[in-house]
């Protein structure tokens, strides 16, 4: 697991213009209540640079995203003080004696069994979008889709597509 709001035990509040291109494209066609699995190729994620030390160069990323709510810019400004007070720091990778970093134990032992699992969606369930992202909706919500200027409240888990290693999750943060 390299990223998951589930492991934090809380949703994450994001501004769509601040996320990677693949996330933005996936979110723009979601309605509140939708749960979407999305596979994002490297050119729409962190490209050849990666996001060291957690995400290697040219990594395809898999996310499960639950769109909880959409805030307009005015609503986001009205709640900005509350959001800032509730911000939780991103976990820092553990340094090794050799000067590198432990990316993850990759046994996902701290990832809750009740949270979405990497194996929950199979290859044949995905549909490829024109941008190159692949999506599968496990639940379809209703309501207004966000636009790129909205702030969204989401639950999510991010896996390295190559091995299912969780790199972040809202489910593991308290």
Segment roles from a protein language model:
Residues 1-174:
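Cross-family detector of peptidyl-prolyl cis-trans isomerase
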């Amino acid at each position: 697991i390299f990223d998951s709001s589930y492991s934090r035990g809380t949703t994450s509040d994001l501004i769509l213009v601040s996320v990677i291109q693949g996330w933005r494209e996936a979110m723009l066609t979601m309605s509140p209540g939708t749960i979407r699995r999305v596979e994002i190729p490297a050119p729409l994620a962190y490209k050849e640079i990666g996001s060291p030390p957690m995400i290697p160069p040219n990594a395809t990323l898999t996310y499960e995203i639950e769109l909880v709510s959409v805030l307009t810019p005015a609503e986001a400004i009205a709640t900005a003080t509350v959001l800032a007070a509730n911000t939780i720091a991103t976990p820092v990778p553990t340094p090794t004696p050799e000067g590198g970093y432990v990316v993850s134990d990759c046994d996902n032992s701290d990832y809750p069994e009740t949270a979405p699992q990497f194996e929950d969606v199979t290859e044949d369930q995905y549909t490829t979008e024109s941008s190159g992202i692949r999506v599968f909706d496990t639940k379809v919500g209703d309501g207004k889709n966000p636009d790129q200027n909205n702030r969204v409240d989401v639950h999510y888990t991010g896996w390295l597509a190559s091995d299912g290693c969780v790199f972040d999750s809202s489910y593991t943060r308290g």
